[in-house]
Amino acid sequence: MADKKTVTPEEKKLAAEKHVDGLVQKALVALEEMRKLDQEQVDYIVAKASVAALDAHGELALHAFEETGRGVFEDKATKNLFACEHVVNNMRHTKTVGVIEEDDVTGLTLIAEPVGVVCGITPTTNPTSTAIFKSLISLKTRNPIVFAFHPSAQESSAHAAQIVRDAAIKAGAPENCVQWITEPSMEATSALMNHEGVATILATGGNAMVKAAYSCGKPALGVGAGNVPAYVEKSANIRQAAHDIVMSKSFDNGMVCASEQAVIIDKEIYDEFVAEFKSYHTYFVNKKEKALLEEFCFGVKANSKNCAGAKLNADIVGKPATWIAEQAGFTVPEGTNILAAECKEVGENEPLTREKLSPVIAVLKSESREDGITKARQMVEFNGLGHSAAIHTADEELTKEFGKAVKAIRVICNSPSTFGGIGDVYNAFLPSLTLGCGSYGRNSVGDNVSAINLLNIKKVGRRRNNMQWMKLPSKTYFERDSIQYLQKCRDVERVMIVTDHAMVELGFLDRIIEQLDLRRNKVVYQIFADVEPDPDITTVNRGTEIMRAFKPDTIIALGGGSPMDAAKVMWLFYEQPEVDFRDLVQKFMDIRKRAFKFPLLGKKTKFIAIPTTSGTGSEVTPFAVISDKANNRKYPIADYSLTPTVAIVDPALVLTVPGVVAADTGMDVLTHATEAYVSQMASDYTDGLALQAIKLVFENLESSVKNADFHSREKMHNASTIAGMAFANAFLGISHSMAHKIGAQFHTIHGRTNAILLPYVIRYNGTRPAKTATWPKYNYYRADEKYQDIARMLGLPASTPEEGVESYAKAVYELGERVGIQMNFKAQGIDEKEWKEHSRELAFLAYEDQCSPANPRLPMVDHMQEIIEDSYYGYKERPGRRK
């Protein structure tokens, strides 16, 4: 007789790999067939498969009970029912095929695709219900599944999978939609998890198995162990809490991972609760029996030197309380369903505070709420991180406090944790037999696993234009002597006027006070007249302190851009004293999505802006430019909360403005309008304003400077505000970015700086770039065409975009010269060497400026450095390098 051949480990491994490869290859074929199923077919398959499993739920429960010798037949039947009924009902209307969602407003379309072949790992604790659950969610998502069952539950698990498979195939699923390893082994399970054809691993089991799943280099939905505390606080419904915990802990002899492992009871209700607990056939072990129980369950006794290495005796899992007591060496009354052991603390010294997966529960007394929460937290952190924790209380706030304190994904309130954890019976958690523990438990999933976890959701994003806006002061008054509105403005009693010394000396401040004195009510006012050109943050802070002391209900900003800008930031600091200046100056791409959200203003005061120069447009804009002179920085601050409440545009206030100032501010108006017109955020609403402002400047600036007649001064004053309205909503570009930084470094006049730079910027933006700016509405580069539009409007040569760009740049330069501006920085008294030394730094700072993102061409630092260097000599001598 021949000797029986001995199979070597290598041969065993190769055989397992061959078997697994065959299963996976068939699953891959099934995957392609399942992709062809529509939603109606999928739902029909799931319905038929679930009904077949439901029909056999008792038979399967008995098979599992007889094969494993663990748990309670009736409870296993309930778990099978749960998998067939609650899980399927929850995902009944879930779309898992093709287009599952379409939103015309956001432009998003979601398309569901299967993840691929699923490796299903099942435990001995819930063999049939887990097989049913994983098969059904795989069928729902068109994923073939290949199981590796726990060896001790191979037959019953395969029985469950076969029933689901056969019903699914009969309903139209492909032949190999559900498969399993027929000869279980570690080698086969490892081969399945590591097979390149397997897309994801759905693992339920011990920590070692879950860790192995996560080590396979592919997506894994593995879940961790639980060590669930139930804290019974003194306000709890004692009868309900005792009932729930006994029902939960005894269910299937404690084999559900969400079952309570310890009950923590406030001292005030301890005796009453224990008595209620005992009435449900819970046996409290004495000191001697506790030691025997510890020795049998964990091989150590409390406070012994080997406690740290205690390991659960797997034989007790799912066994009856009477059997465990007998094996431990003591007897308990017939019908005992839970063994309770009073413990002094949570942790290694009390082995019974570990997870036990059996009808054995630790009982601890809490001295206070804080102590109860602490003990519950310690339980969760004692090898149960992320899983579940329960609390029984009538105090809603305590429930929230408990939820914040424990590192558990599921916090179950006033419910049995077994059913609370698996969901849908006592609460609105997703029904599942695979419970994720999140990062606390080193899991990739932090929720109850369901069909959604087995889908690849593809997103189709249709291009959409961002919603745009027109935000301006609620009221804008214009025409001569419109300052009389101050007589009629409502709710004006305490007025702070922010201005500068020039307004005092020219008598404009007196004219404002005169209007306030004509009101029917007596007005108290505070004057802050210390605003300097390019106001410094220290000036703003001084004004804010005065404002806080005075407590105005109205702020009037009187003057040019400097008083209005300073007053805006004082307004912000006054109403929102906690705001940090550094937060205000941060750059943004989209003002609505900025990292720092400006607070809303206007709750304490209204803001009335009265311009006395025709340049900044600050009376209608959300912008303020504040300097940090200690660091040679100038910061443009932008937010619509800074938009004035009321603007009064009275041309009578600009009649005495010196011609040189009118020239500088007028060219600033032209720059505002030009940059707003070509901005990537320009719209139909801002374009008309920008073009009208440009037209008014070319028609009236020269006369305004040289003749100072009322008509031209009025038109330029209107142009300033109209341009402000345009750039308040379309924003600016790199002419202002560079002007801010040059002005901060060399203290040049802002409008004049823009005048010198603007021809260069027109040529730069008017050249088709290699890198364009980012804004959805700006769907193609068109700055050159828009400059051509301006040139045509002005009657300049513009037969092509290129000609229009050159004509307009030249016209801007010549207008600057005609109004007396020396159109280069050399003439501004700046040293050439110093200018070149700072050119690179200024270009970097300009790139970071808030005005740069709206420029129609993505501004490159090298290019801005060239513009800065060329502009020293002026457009006529060095017109710039077209790039």
Describe each region flagged by the PLM:
Residues A2-T109, I137, S279:
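N-terminal Rossmann-like NAD(P)+-binding subdomain of aldehyde/semialdehyde dehydrogenases
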Residues T6-V7, K13-L14, I132, V210-G347:
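ALDH superfamily catalytic-core signature
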Residues R35, F330-N466:
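Conserved C-terminal structural/oligomerization subdomain of aldehyde/semialdehyde dehydrogenase
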Residues M91, A160, T538-A652:
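Glycine/threonine-rich beta-strand-loop-alpha-helix active-site module
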Residues V99-Q240:
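Rossmann-like NAD(P) dinucleotide-binding subdomain of oxidoreductase/dehydrogenase enzymes
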Residues M467-T554, F825:
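ATP/NTP phosphate-donor binding region
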Residues V620-A730:
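Carboxylate- and glycine-rich phosphate/diphosphate-binding segment that chelates Mg2+/Mn2+
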Residues Q745-T748, R752-E837, E877-R878, R882:
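Gly/Pro-rich interdomain helix-loop hinge
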